Amino acid sequence: MIAHASRSLSIIGAGLAGSLLAILLSRQGWRITLYERRGDPRVADYESGRSINLALAERGRNALRQAGVEDEVMARAVMMRGRMVHPREGEPQLQRYGRDDSEVIWSIHRSDLNTTLLELAEQAGATVHFHRRLHTVDFDAGYARFIDDRDDSPHDIRFDTLIGADGAGSALRAAMNRRAPLGEDIAFLDHSYKELEIPPADDGSFRIERNALHIWPRGHYMCIALPNHEGTFTVTLFLPNQGDPSFATINTGAQAEALFAREFADTLPLIPNLRADWEQHPPGLLGTLTLDRWHQQGRAVLIGDAAHAMVPFHGQGMNCAFEDCVALARHLMEADDLEGAFAAFEAERKPNARAIQQMALENYLEMRDRVADPAFLLQRELEQELQRRWPTRFVPHYTMVTFLHTPYAEALRRTELQRDMLVAATTGHDSLDNIDWAALEAQIHAQLPVLEGAH
């Protein structure tokens, strides 16, 4: 165990991961100080660089459970049973995520979650300093300078160890990279996103089905909508950066309204502020960040988006970051020194982060192109039947990622095996009537051992 005299940590970023890690470590006896470049969201209008609604899955709930804060968070969450797919023509169809209401995900607004976790971090004993933007780090001397952007005043601290929970544009990562290159690679998607809002009905109720993630798939672009506790939906349009239509061709609110009238007609009456929202909100970038190294000896380590930002299409960015928090807290308890803890943390989490980054990109293609594809729907039907027959062996991809604690890397390995089985078994078929069940059973028993936690 790390000596008591060394048990002081400074966390850069008081967002979701930073606040949760502060709770976990404060309760383990660490002296925790958080530094946040923005103001306190509890006393000022919430400002976030990225506010796509968050999908809370079992991995994230498990981390909240371990921190003892699950009940407080879940009071603000809205259940989503599945994807409500809105075709161009015809009625919306619900594609369930799991078998029943024990297998669902939850929508929560970033600001609600952040303020809740901040309150609980302070209650656990952490100290939070707002308006502190990391400017300079001297890793050898254990010295850091922060700037208050309200008046450009400097604030200097001495530190033992820094933890970077400051997001995809991490200032700590930049400082570490200047000291010794981290092997940083950022691959931006050729799509960006823009956020809009469906307000509540006049009586305060939800205007569309509240317990679903709504998707309007349209090939190379799509809309999604996630419910909020107060009756609103956060709508996100994902559109190419170039081509027609794209963010290069849809510039004005009037052009956006015409796009929605043509492609997402049933949403148009639901978004009364479409024109104004379009012109006020700039498009957000979508990218995948990979690093060769997440830590610098025992002086600094990165977690969450600061280490492995991903595209949001599997709803796992926050869940993965929360798993990081639990893993780092565990390694800090088990290791004899900080460098050993950070190295063990990186060795455990990096392969899993790479796996969910890949699966998030693949899920984008599925959501955008395949949820209305008959071949894909037949594979989904077969997947559900195989799960019914062999529930502990053939576990659907979404179940492994969202409802179990299967390491992401293992979930990816099994997913690729199962995908090959589904494609091979359904090729040339338009129903399950002539499926070779005996051959599939032999394959499943040979290639898919019983999965821990499956039932």
Swiss-Prot record:
Broadest EC class assigned to this enzyme: oxidoreductase
Domain of life the protein comes from: Bacteria
Reaction(s) catalysed by this chain's protein: L-kynurenine + NADPH + O2 + H(+) = 3-hydroxy-L-kynurenine + NADP(+) + H2O
Cofactor: FAD
Pfam families, per the entry: FAD_binding_3
The enzyme's E.C. designation: 1.14.13.9
GO molecular function: FAD binding; kynurenine 3-monooxygenase activity
Protein keywords: FAD, Flavoprotein, Monooxygenase, NADP, Oxidoreductase, Pyridine nucleotide biosynthesis
Metabolic or biological pathway, per its Swiss-Prot or TrEMBL entry: Cofactor biosynthesis; NAD(+) biosynthesis; quinolinate from L-kynurenine: step 1/3
Gene Ontology terms: biological process: anthranilate metabolic process; kynurenine metabolic process; L-tryptophan catabolic process; NAD biosynthetic process; quinolinate biosynthetic process
InterPro entries: FAD-bd, FAD/NAD-bd_sf, Kynurenine_monooxygenase
Known function: Catalyzes the hydroxylation of L-kynurenine (L-Kyn) to form 3-hydroxy-L-kynurenine (L-3OHKyn). Required for synthesis of quinolinic acid.
Database matches in HAMAP family: Kynurenine_monooxygenase (MF_01971)
Family from the record: Belongs to the aromatic-ring hydroxylase family. KMO subfamily.
Identification of the protein by name: Kynurenine 3-monooxygenase
Species annotation: Stenotrophomonas maltophilia (strain K279a)
Gene that encodes it: kmo
